[in-house]
């Protein structure tokens, strides 16, 4: 690499790192993801997102005004061709505490799922159960996952289109049994930024399709739709995510989120709007010769606008 290219590479890396660090810091602060004394179990898959999450969290750990531990954990699910040496070698260089767990969920999935069907759903459930249990064993107070903003938005549309639910991935989640708190520090980060960051940092990426499973076709379709929107209407994806943070249950139709049944009017409420302005001059009289402006002198008070007889 030439000196000029190396300089551009470093400049771009620094700029991108600052942006990602700022976005992760904002997400942590907004949702109180990490507190003083926390023991964070950082789940590492070998993909670009989890590498970036660990890298940024370790960076923030050095600058944060609070103290917290980071423990990296990878689950080796015994997929064919999984390079077992890659993650230990990388983590040894970082000098970060880590655990490599081994559980043959691959065989379970292949036994339960017919050939040619997507295995991701069952595989992720088995992985989640193992990681949740291990977090309790080591006394982790938070489990950090590498889902980013695109994952969250895609999940919203997947649940809308195929599940009939307005449901996404929350940046912070309490497990159903109440035993674990899951955090997603990359909730504000764009996937394309994480991909570029991983390339610039030259993380030793492990392919996610070693099991031979095809990508979830429904998720792929939603991703294509969102990418097309992003190209045609710049800023739309940001607006969608902002909308997800500004919900108004009283303006929706979900009876579980708002008590529509008990709504009653207040007969003693002060008059407002059109009722309060009933004694003002009528504004139906426009002076066309004066650029359509209201001619208050020609306006008359209206006692009765229309009378209807039934």
UniProtKB/Swiss-Prot annotation:
GO terms for molecular function: 4 iron, 4 sulfur cluster binding; ATP binding; magnesium ion binding; sulfurtransferase activity; tRNA binding. A motif (PP-loop motif) lies at residues 45-50. It is found in: Cytoplasm. The keyword Acyltransferase does not apply. One of its GO terms (biological process) is tRNA thio-modification. InterPro entries: Rossmann-like_a/b/a_fold (IPR014729), TilS/TtcA_N (IPR011063), tRNA_Cyd_32_2_STrfase (IPR012089), tRNA_thiolation_TtcA_Ctu1 (IPR035107). Pfam families: ATP_bind_3 (PF01171). Keywords: 4Fe-4S, ATP-binding, Cytoplasm, Iron, Iron-sulfur, Magnesium, Metal-binding, Nucleotide-binding, RNA-binding, Transferase, tRNA processing, tRNA-binding. Pathway: tRNA modification. It comes from the Bacteria. Its EC number is 2.8.1.-. Homodimer. Belongs to the TtcA family. NCBIfam families: PRK10696.1 (NF007972). HAMAP family: TtcA. The thiolation reaction likely consists of two steps: a first activation step by ATP to form an adenylated intermediate of the target base of tRNA, and a second nucleophilic substitution step of the sulfur (S) atom supplied by the hydrosulfide attached to the Fe-S cluster. This is tRNA-cytidine(32) 2-sulfurtransferase. It comes from Shewanella baltica (strain OS185).
């Amino acid at each position: 690499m030439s000196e000029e290219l190396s300089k551009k590479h470093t400049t771009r890396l620094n700029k991108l790192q600052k942006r990602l660090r700022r976005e992760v810091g904002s997400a942590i602060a907004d949702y109180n993801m990490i507190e003083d004394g926390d023991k964070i179990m950082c789940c590492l898959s070998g993909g670009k997102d989890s590498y970036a999450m660990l890298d940024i969290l370790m960076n923030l750990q050095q600058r944060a005004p609070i103290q917290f531990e980071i423990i990296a954990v990878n689950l080796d699910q015994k997929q064919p061709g999984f390079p077992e040496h890659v993650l230990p070698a990388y983590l040894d260089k970082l000098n970060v505490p880590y655990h490599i767990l081994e559980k043959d969920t691959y065989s379970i999935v292949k036994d339960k799922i017919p050939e040619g069907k997507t295995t991701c759903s069952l595989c992720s459930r088995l992985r989640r159960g193992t990681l949740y249990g291990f977090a309790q064993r080591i006394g982790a107070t938070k489990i950090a996952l590498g889902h980013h903003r695109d994952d969250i938005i895609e999940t919203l549309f997947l649940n809308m289109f195929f599940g009939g639910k307005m449901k996404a991935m929350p940046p912070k989640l309490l497990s159903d049994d109440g035993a674990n708190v899951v955090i997603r520090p990359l909730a504000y980060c764009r996937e394309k930024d994480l991909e570029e960051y991983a390339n610039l940092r030259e993380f030793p990426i492990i392919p996610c399709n070693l099991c031979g499973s095809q990508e979830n076709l429904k998720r792929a379709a939603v991703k294509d739709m969102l990418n097309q929107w992003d190209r045609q209407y710049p800023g739309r994806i940001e607006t969608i995510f902002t909308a997800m943070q500004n919900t108004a249950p009283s303006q929706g139709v979900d009876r579980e989120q708002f008590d529509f049944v008990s709504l009653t009017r207040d007969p003693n409420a002060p008059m407002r709007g059109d009722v309060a302005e009933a004694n003002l001059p009528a504004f139906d009289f426009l002076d066309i010769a004066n650029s359509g402006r209201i001619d208050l002198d020609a306006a008359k008070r209206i006692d009765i606008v229309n009378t209807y007889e039934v």
